[in-house]
């Protein structure tokens, strides 16, 4: 049995391509390309080599660490994530990340990290 208000309001089949995003922006070494389907935002995020949230997005976000939750699939490269509580992990291709607010992240190695993130509402930074 579904809880009231948990079902999506999907009325028709939809298709979009991240190679033709509805919204795109670059902050330092981090690029974001977003499409929106109903209430779901799908964002391809590219952390170039040397990218670090606290250096590339901190000033823009206005917070000491990223305060947005993330659910994402890593497609290529590696990403190190350190939470405000000190816990940390490294994510590689095929890994699913589920991060609560309060973290920093940066690329590991000499390959950009690309991941696709799924969010709803205002769970992503807009330029």
Put a short name on every predicted segment.
Residues 44-65:
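Conserved short histidine dyad/triad with adjacent acidic residue
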Residues 100-125:
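Ligand-binding loop in jelly-roll beta-barrel domains
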Residues 1-46, 54:
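A short, N-terminal "cap"/entry segment at the start of jelly-roll beta-barrel domains
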Residues 18, 49-51, 120-122, 127:
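Glyoxalase I/VOC metalloenzyme domain signal
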Residues 38-43, 49, 70, 75-77, ...:
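A generic structural signal for short beta-strands and their flanking turns/coil linkers
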Residues 52-53, 77-82, 105:
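Short beta-strand segments in beta-sandwich/barrel cores
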Residues 59-85:
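Glycine- and acidic-residue-biased ligand/ion/polar-headgroup-sensing regions
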Residues 83-102:
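Short acidic-glycine-tyrosine-enriched beta hairpin
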